[in-house]
């Protein structure tokens, strides 16, 4: 029978989980039916490609857990839709995706983002309660539920949020293994380790720390037995990874070549970069400072766990000093550990002050985290500048007009003419079964839609070996190329890297050969800046909080120019 204390504890837990859910689920429809997150199509398109070319994803930059998990979700959606008469066959399923991918992205964002995000909050509570105390568990979950970095990334389809859940479970199961070295704890730790690495390879960064702490910190087994135990864990983990990601081994050459190429995208960022940018914006200085105090205080009560958390944070952060990209999501694995340490620190510090002061300070800490998340959700609910711009184009520019854009992503996602789509069949990549089928469906949809002759500025030569298939045709960045296609309008967004396109625009504007006919700003009316403060949040919403609060909507600053004949 549950006591009043149990009932109160459950009410608090459910309240925190409800808060975590609301902060993550509100706004998950942002941009749809257009996709305004650069990385989401990577997962979604490779997921749907399984239906055309089989289980080998032919994509190994990310492990396949997210792809296979999403495929199962789509399979359930297809079966349910077919039984209800929504889909007649796989072709109609694909046509539905290309006509309006809203349902597909909502499914992905909910299950890979929201669901795994809330589950991670719950699991952190569970781990903290088992290995620390109830107060630490409550504050851990509370701090994590309002963590801007985790809440914002939980709106997206990508591998990071499942990774965080598996890392929290992996951390908890390691503590279980340390305290009770027996078969069930070894298996649990091994399974979560295998799943974590199958979500994202960076989970492996935590293994050297776990191995050394188990080998030299665990006192319940002789040294030789500890080696055998961890060898067993390694074998089971590898087996779990192989089950989830079999083509890592079956297509080893393809895997190796992609991973080797990806290493060029990561490099040295500086010692304090991720601290000042990713963690300061994503977790917040109050939580970071509380975490430091918490680790210090934890040394007096849970010395092994304090040292473990500190070592995990420092080792993971240290690797990302030298091998990382500038995006905040690379620090997501540290967020639950910092929230746990901060919760312990708050539990200790809070005992030394009065009730009023304690509640007031806690409220300020929470507001500092929750207000950015709430404002982000508000922005997610508003129209993106690309949507506003597209509405203007549909009302003011004739279908079939020749439009040139400086970016396929940072400008409105307009539909190309059937003739332009037809020309893609002869380009590199079109022979891929999934892409060929997509072209067939795109051409079918374009026949009944509002289409434009779209060109994308690029320094690459527009031949079969250049650029991405669905960005083509490409256009050299010069005035002669514009004249050659009889360009009628230029669409300039100020978030791409095509600086030469901006220079050309300035030259033509100064020469009186362009006329500005419309502009669309994401910023407040008093803010006329075209380029964003946050130079690295180029996937979806801002990560820099200054950039966030400057905005009245998401999206780039856009300008449309009419080319004078």
Annotated model-derived regions:
Residues 2-3, 129-131, 135, 170-188, ...:
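Membrane-interface transmembrane helices that cradle and orient dolichyl/undecaprenyl
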Residues 66-69, 79-81, 195, 208-301, ...:
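Transmembrane-lumen/periplasm boundary regions of multi-pass, lipid-linked membrane glycan transferases
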Residues 14, 191, 234-235, 299-302, ...:
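Signature aromatic-anchored transmembrane alpha helix within multi-pass, membrane-resident enzymes
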Residues 1, 388-565:
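C-terminal luminal/periplasmic domains and tails of membrane-associated envelope-modifying transferases
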Residues 11-14, 135-141, 173-195, 307-313, ...:
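Short hydrophobic alpha-helices at membrane interfaces in multi-pass membrane enzymes
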Residues 153-154, 160-163, 196, 205, ...:
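Hydrophobic/aromatic-rich transmembrane helices and adjacent perimembrane loops
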Residues 14, 18-21, 98, 102, ...:
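Transmembrane-helix motifs of polytopic, lipid-linked glycan transferases
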Residues 35, 56-112, 253-266, 414-427:
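Interfacial juxtamembrane loops and adjacent helix segments
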């Amino acid at each position: 029978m549950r006591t009043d204390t149990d009932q109160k504890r459950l009410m608090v837990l459910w309240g925190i989980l409800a808060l975590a859910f609301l902060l993550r689920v509100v706004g998950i429809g942002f941009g749809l039916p257009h996709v305004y997150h650069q990385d989401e199509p990577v997962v979604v398109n490779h997921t749907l490609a399984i239906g055309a070319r089989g289980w080998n994803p032919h994509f190994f930059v990310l492990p396949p857990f997210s792809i296979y998990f999403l495929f199962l979700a789509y399979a359930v959606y297809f079966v349910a839709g077919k039984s209800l008469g929504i889909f007649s066959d796989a072709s109609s399923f694909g046509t539905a995706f290309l006509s309006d991918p809203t349902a597909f992205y909502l499914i992905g964002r909910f299950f890979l983002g929201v669901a795994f995000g809330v589950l991670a909050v719950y699991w952190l509570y569970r781990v903290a309660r088992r290995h620390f105390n109830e107060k630490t568990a409550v504050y851990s979950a509370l701090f994590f539920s309002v963590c801007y970095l985790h809440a914002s990334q939980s709106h997206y389809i990508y591998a990071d949020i499942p990774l965080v859940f598996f890392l929290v479970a992996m951390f908890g199961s390691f503590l279980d293994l340390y305290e009770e070295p027996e078969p069930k704890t070894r298996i649990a730790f091994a399974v979560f380790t295998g799943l974590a690495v199958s979500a994202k390879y960076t989970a492996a960064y935590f293994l050297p720390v776990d191995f050394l702490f188990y080998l030299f910190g665990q006192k319940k087994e002789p040294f030789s037995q500890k080696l055998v135990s961890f060898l067993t864990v390694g074998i089971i983990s590898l087996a779990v990874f192989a089950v989830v990601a079999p083509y890592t081994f079956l297509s080893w050459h393809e895997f190796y070549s992609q991973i080797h190429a990806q290493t060029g995208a990561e490099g040295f960022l500086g010692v304090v970069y991720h601290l000042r940018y990713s963690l300061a914006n994503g977790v917040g200085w109050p939580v970071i400072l509380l975490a430091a105090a918490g680790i210090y205080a934890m040394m007096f009560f849970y010395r092994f766990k304090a040292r473990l958390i500190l070592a995990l944070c420092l080792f993971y952060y240290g690797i990302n000093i030298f091998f990382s990209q500038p995006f905040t999501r690379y620090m997501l694995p540290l967020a639950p550990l910092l929230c746990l340490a901060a919760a312990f620190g708050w539990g200790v510090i809070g005992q030394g002050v009065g009730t009023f002061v304690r509640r007031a300070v806690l409220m300020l800490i929470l507001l500092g985290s929750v207000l950015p998340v709430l404002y982000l959700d508000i922005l997610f609910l508003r129209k993106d500048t690309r949507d506003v711009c597209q509405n203007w184009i549909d009302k003011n520019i004739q279908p079939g007009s020749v439009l040139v854009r400086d970016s396929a992503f940072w400008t409105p996602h307009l539909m190309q003419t059937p003739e332009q789509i037809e020309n893609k069949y002869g380009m590199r990549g079109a022979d891929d079964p999934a892409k060929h089928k997509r072209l067939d469906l795109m051409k079918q949809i374009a026949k009944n839609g509002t289409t434009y002759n779209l060109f994308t500025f690029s320094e690459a030569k527009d031949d079969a070996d250049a650029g991405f298939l669905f960005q083509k045709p490409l256009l050299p960045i010069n005035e002669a190329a514009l004249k050659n296609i009889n360009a009628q309008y230029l669409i300039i967004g100020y978030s791409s890297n095509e600086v030469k396109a901006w220079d050309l625009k300035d030259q033509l504007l100064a020469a009186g050969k362009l006329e500005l006919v419309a502009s669309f700003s994401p910023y407040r009316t008093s803010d006329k800046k075209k380029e964003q403060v946050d130079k690295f949040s180029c996937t979806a919403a801002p990560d820099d909080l200054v950039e966030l609060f400057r905005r009245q909507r998401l999206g780039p600053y856009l300008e449309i120019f009419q080319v004078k004949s």
